[in-house]
Amino acid sequence: MNGVVARPGDKDTVPADKFKKASPWKIGMSHFGVSANTWATQMAAESQAAAKSDPRISQFVLLDANLSQAKQIADIDDLIAQKVDAIIITPVSPTSADAGIEKAINAGIPVIVHTGLTKTDKFTVDIQGGGENFGKVSGEFLVKELGGKGNIWVLRGLPTHPEDINRYKGLLEAIKGTDIKIVAEDAGLWSYDYGHKVCETFYLENRKVDGIWSSGADMSRACMDVFQQYGAKVPPITGEVNNGFLQKWIESGVDAIATEYGPEQGAAAVRAAVALLDGKAIHKRYVYEPDGWNLEKAKANYRPDLSEKFWMPSSLTDTDLKALYGK
């Protein structure tokens, strides 16, 4: 996956042949919530497509925690009981997968974690999209746009999810020492519907706002729709690299940034599992901290032939993309 590199300064590696096994392989995945939002749905599809494309993987078992910590604990136990050859985990919370990770490692099963940090470091490989970087890049955009002062709204994702926690932390770091104040904050759950409700509530309570920071997913597009619904100008806003947001941005020309957090991380985790089972030596920790997209890049990558639910970057084939998101 472009942009994924070994975490700077971290020299821990997984030795060659430590988890080497003859194929065919059975790989399991504990997903935090496939239906949480359109990004989570596509990340699952990216994972499944990557597994399907490798003939050495005979079975890919994806279990959906549906945002339940208790369900994730049970799912990981289930995958261990099924004697899968590797487990991929996207944690519901910073601690929801810790016990399961340690159980799997003790059973000799390598564990790949992505899309959220864990308290434990017993995992085999960690691939993180840099939540703090996401929040900081988008926060710094607002600092620059507002000249270091003004009132902003904050739309959180899932406040207990490690990715949202770190994105918010990055925002706070970006506005530290400035005269930017958070005057309204609530959780839009990374969804269009909840994001719309939160933004409309903010607007009706006090429409005077200088900028909007969003934790991403479908909330930014929803907030733009609220302003357009009331015939008001959209203030500087942060978004994510989603086809729907890019379309709104291009059509409106609003001052914005799209921060990248590709669902291709799902495929990257499958490739990491394959590398381990194939006996390759790889790093323990990887990081993915791309720059934000400007309007020029948005125009160059927007896909008018695909729906607003499509996220970038993606490793899905064009045939798969059109089957899933074609208009």
Language model: regions and residue ranges:
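A residue-level marker of the well-folded mature domains of exported/periplasmic proteins
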Residues: 1-327
